[in-house]
């Protein structure tokens, strides 16, 4: 239930990004003690928003949830601490907003490869059309960082 999950979250930072069709961001997370929960939404355009459970011992560890967020459906997605997050841009451009309950801490930054075959995520973007930052192209597979979680 959305109210139960978000009611006690104290958001401390708001962010906004602008991207164009084909951009894939992620899959990013922060390790404790700087782990972050996020509340994300689209102001303009459309994305496929993805969260991957990285909580060791969770019955859904390594599984993902993918939800379309758009300016038309007005959906938001809450990503709890312990999940990696990413999105793909499905419209010509997107303005994406997210609230975080902890500040960005580069020393605790972690990531999983967007195209990790073990995660089997359908980003709804053809692989040859996916646009990634140099940084996002170099992330390891989940199985290669298990000891760091």
Model-derived regions: residue spans:
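Recognition helices and adjacent regulatory flanks at domain boundaries
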Residues: 83-85
